[in-house]
Amino acid sequence: IESPAQTRLNKKAQVETFEELAITSSLVRPAGASYCLQFIDRHRKMKMGVRDWEFLHPSLEPILSETHDVCAFQEDVTKICHHVAGLSFKQADKIRKMMNSLHEGSVEDRLWIETEREFLAGCIKNSGLTVEQARELWMRVSSFTGFSFCKSHSASYAQLSFKCTYLKAHYPAQFLAAVISNNHGFYSKDAYINEARRWGIRILPLDINKSGIKYVGKHNWMRPGIMHVRNLTDKTSSRIVEEKGIREFANVEDFISRVGAYRHEVENLVLAGAFDGFGLNQPELLYVIDGIYGRHRSLAENGLQFDVFGTRDRHPNHSDYSLTEKCLNELHILGFMLSGNILDILDLHPKSKGTVPAGEIANFVGKGIKVFGWPVTERVHTVSTTGKTMMFLTLEDQTGSMDVIFWPRNYGRFADVLAKPGPYEVWGKVTEEWDTHCLEAVNIRSAEWSPSQIDFELASQRLTRSAGYVYTDLPGIVAA
């Protein structure tokens, strides 16, 4: 239920119960998507005690009362074919299977035409539908083609969704840590990290003595695991956990001596911040590592025994990396930033330069605005009636996420821009439909960037001013 389409549908339909979620979980699939608006309109009115519609035929009420005369599940098709059209359950199930795998071709077309004739005749003879009613019902049934859910499948999704929603509401740190640790959900891992920040969860530093392989959350904090460190092998990860279980690592020399990791693995751990608790800054740690592995290579070439502690304390003072440099290193090593946000680095912060934060677009319905955002998901959609292409895009800033729509007339103009990684600067008009808001885009610019274009000092100042990112360890927090 976390996809943008499902989230919008649930909000529009005012979904509150398990049964309602089971219905919308199926309606959002391709087979039922064309009836979503009809269901939403009727469902919202029914919640207010208003019913301004009638069933196409009384025989449909026992089958479609829960979904307000809308086909939502595969069983709806089977029941209509059997109870209304008078077909056998075997014939009805055959039609259901045909609809889920309908392909164009002379044989399929001929079979479908024969099925239609049998269905229409059965509705008229068995249930007393008029010709017009029978044709309307066939149009509904035949349009319910493509991927859809049976009710038990949709209910199982709803059950899992309710459990996850409860966990996120009451144990957000634990839940989000588990989502990230298990290869995340619908969105990328950095989207869940940013979501945790918006929930007030402190993202603690990666720490070789306190981090496990997976992420751990508790109370109002989350500790990253080492699982996303670039090129860190499973063997080395397991060895780290095994050795720190015996005793904590005293310094980087102790780590190398006991774990026996490759040089690039140790360097990546340094740049991810895992050794920041050893009293040396990252450039100094890299200098020590260079000395250890350089000495090892030299001694090995001369057939001499290597002593990893032979280089201890042999390092000059080095200036630490700026906060911006650390963020960019994290992006390279982890795939996301632990210590900051790319929008701050690029000076694309909400409320700057006349932009509207994602969390406030609901206040600008009917108005033209500009937003900055990092893309978290997108979906290209072909309009069935015209064959033209449009895009649904979800952008994120420090305040939340927002849905952006590029209608066909604009998607064609900006498809080349949307192919770039972002972040994006988007102009458009805010619209509202059934309590949901989106931005109908009219223009877009990709904020292309590279490290060479960044003013590191100014960017670091912006990162420092942006609250909620960099945290030292908190008292009482133990190893994961």
Predicted features and spans:
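Noncatalytic, beta-rich nucleic-acid-contacting surfaces in large DNA/RNA-processing enzymes
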Residues: 1-480
